[in-house]
Amino acid sequence: MNGLPAVKGFIETGFVDWAGKVASVVFLPRCNFSCPYCHNHRLVSDPESYRTFDLDEVLERMEALRGWLDGVTVTGGEPTIHKELPSFLKVFKERRWKVKLDTNGSNPAMLGELIDGGLISAVSLDVKAPLEEIPYRRNAGRGADPCAVRRSLELLARSEVPAELRTTVHTGLLSVAEMARIITQTSEIFGCYKAIKWQACQVSDTLDPSLPKNGASDRETLSRLVLEAEELAKTSGHLTEGGPTS
């Protein structure tokens, strides 16, 4: 469809992208972040090397699975950099599909428009680091603005749209103390303890090929780091079992 973002990847049925849902996955090109551990970097730097899926084909393949699919996850890249994103999502909503948006939170104005327009049923927002300039730009690139990410989190905290927060852990890029600050900062924004989906960093085929391989955590190590961070957040005096303290 003319004027809409190009679809550069399509998974007909996904079981892990939207918790508790069976959803198709649509990939949009380009991104305004440059995370060193990004494994979709060719979708960002060279999207023309990927096939473009006709949106009508995507819709037809989804329609054939109606009754089995719950909806579609729109991911990237970073979907919110596309000014035509609201019109793109309307195509799915008009066909009675629920939409989950994956975002880095860098465009709160666009996120607010999507929320106000009823165009998204859920959001997964990637929190790259504590909401502070130095660690955020280290983990997401020099153009990353943690203040914009904070505004996106505040929008989600005020809305009724279910929000999942995700953080990728590479021990060379994120310390336990920084993980603890992510916990306290996001919990303060949401007014209660906000669970985070911690993800081990996959170090094969990353944007930064020099990213140390030993920074990737296995499941056991990641669980230990998360427990340490949660305990540190509690002992810091900023987080209690019932939520953040004033």
Which stretches of residues belong to each language-model region?
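Conserved alpha-helical substructure of the radical SAM core
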Residues: H41-V72
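Canonical Radical SAM [4Fe-4S] cluster-binding loop centered on the CxxxCxxC motif
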Residues: W18-F53
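Short glycine-enriched, charge-decorated loop/helix-capping segments at active-site entrances
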Residues: R42-S49, Y136-G143, S210-A216
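A secondary-structure boundary/capping signal
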Residues: F27, T75-G76
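SEC14/CRAL-TRIO lipid-binding/transfer domains and related phosphoinositide-recognition modules
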Residues: P5-I11, R30, L43-V44, E57
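Auxiliary Fe-S-binding modules of radical SAM enzymes
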Residues: M1-V16, G20, L173-S246
